Amino acid sequence: MNLFTEMRGLVLEALEQMQAEGALPQGLDFANVAVEPPRDAAHGDMATNAAMVLAKPAGQKPRDIAETLAARLAADARVAKAEVAGPGFLNLTLAAPVWQRVVGTVLLDGTAYGRSDMGQGKKVNVEYVSANPTGPLHVGHTRGAVFGDALASLLDYAGYQVTREYYINDGGAQVDVLARSVYLRYLEAHGQAVEFVDGTYPGEYLVEVGQALKDKVGDAYVGQPEEVWLEAIRDFATDAMMELIRADLAQLGVKMDVFYSEKSLYGTGRIEAAIDSLRAKGLIYRGTLEPPKGKLPEDWEPREQTLFKSTEHGDDVDRPIMKSDGAWTYFAPDIAYHYDKVSRGFDALIDVFGADHGGYVKRMKAAVSALSDGRVPLDIKLCQLVKLWKNGEPFKMSKRAGNFVTLRDVVDQVGADVTRFVMLTRKNDAPLDFDFDKVLEQSRENPVFYVQYAHARVSSVLRRAAEAGIDTSDTALRAADLGLLGHEAELAVMRKLAEWPRLVEIAARTNEPHRIAFYLYELAGDFHALWNRGNDVSELRFIQDGDEGTSQAKIALARSVAVVISAGLAILGVTPAEEMR
């Protein structure tokens, strides 16, 4: 049940009645009529812009429309008050039974409360992490992994059919560097002294890979030229790194549906097929690009190249797809990969990249637009940097990794649940400070604790109720007299619960899972406020001695809070706490 959708339906019904009676002309478009929370809660529970958006096409003053509409809405039992404000905004205050009904709906639906069919089963591909298979995941990958995973869960909750995908960058030069680095560790495992020069990976995580290679092939590659061992070690090392990365993701609770190899695009005709598709649309040509201002990109050459006419699909400049020597640019396999996604029948694509890929957005959107004839939208979400702090100082790098803080460093310090929640306490395109000390504090300033504490408090109420012999079964709580919940602090919690279905749809429509974390913090705040009021006002306590009926109504409210928190945390990939330790 989306109460805002229900009340919008009431507004539209009243507008149609006004049309039937001649108070409004026929043929008006109601598509932009909205019912939303007011900017100022003091103005009521909901507000509608109906009069403002209909005034011009109706040829009437907005305030006149609003006053007629207000009179009609006030006649409905669900509306306690309808007031016209300013030039024609209409504020609605709903009757208490409307809010009380929300509690019953939450208890009846369980964690399915707020689920939406907005997606209508459309197929969405969410690609995230996609780190080079050259080492363990670092903290930047961690943010992208959490964001992408939570977004995929959110879209699933909103009715989409979601595929979670990891693109393995195993076709580029960095994999050759990995192979050479592993070869050095292989020689080291044979007792040779080695030196890591610039352009190799010195991380200790490759020691085990070098030893494993020795165990597999013995001394077969010792003293051999690179052409003998490069390809074999490249495959061996990539497999080892992907096993490491899969283990990192598992530690964070991230499971992919598809691991797609870049290497599979080469020698299979897939790149050629994608480029041929663009060529058939007149979007491939031979030409020379003007040198861009500032630092020259690696794919620019002062000679004729094969170019993609990406400017016809919103890009700033056309992009090289083949170098003058006939080799593909790095953009060509990316085009082919997204052509494959489009060919798999996805209705929408989402790519989650690091902030350093900002210059990549327009060209990739242009490619997908061209490949799909504008049918398949691509949304690219960029995750900004994470700064780590401990004891008031920047957190030092992992010796094992060589030069960066790993995902495991973070999860080992605070656990997967805390890591995931904190990574979603800022919008993805805003920098995030991750303070190892603060995220473990038991205070309101720590949103992880604050939300989990609300859920744990509900669990404690249920345990105390059981000890007092109060029936808190689903049947008993659903049958409770919710009309006993009339205090403003209780109604505030119910109003927040009513926002959940609408919030889910907004977050899914904008691809912004951080909205879920923000909402949970606000819901927890309203619940804690009610709890704290109970310390001073005995009738607000959840267990009323000697009054099972009132206790059951109040416990029903508490239980509904826990249900929604559980649903929200599930989207974020966080396990709700039954008690705080």
Swiss-Prot record:
EC number: 6.1.1.19
Chain location of the short sequence motif 'HIGH' region per the record: 131-141
Main location: cytoplasm
The reaction(s) this protein catalyses: tRNA(Arg) + L-arginine + ATP = L-arginyl-tRNA(Arg) + AMP + diphosphate
Organism for this UniProt entry: Ruegeria pomeroyi (strain ATCC 700808 / DSM 15171 / DSS-3) (Silicibacter pomeroyi)
Subunit and partners: Monomer.
NCBIfam families in the record: argS
Annotated compartments: Cytoplasm
InterPro entries for this protein: aa-tRNA-synth_I_CS, Arg-tRNA-ligase, Arg-tRNA-synth_N, Arg-tRNA-synth_N_sf, ArgRS_core, DALR_anticod-bd, Rossmann-like_a/b/a_fold, tRNAsynth_Ia_anticodon-bd
Lineage of source species: Bacteria, Pseudomonadati, Pseudomonadota, Alphaproteobacteria, Rhodobacterales
CDD domains: ArgRS_core
Keyword tags: Aminoacyl-tRNA synthetase, ATP-binding, Cytoplasm, Ligase, Nucleotide-binding, Protein biosynthesis
The name this protein goes by in its record: Arginine--tRNA ligase
Family of this protein: Belongs to the class-I aminoacyl-tRNA synthetase family.
GO process terms (BP): arginyl-tRNA aminoacylation
Signal peptide interval: none
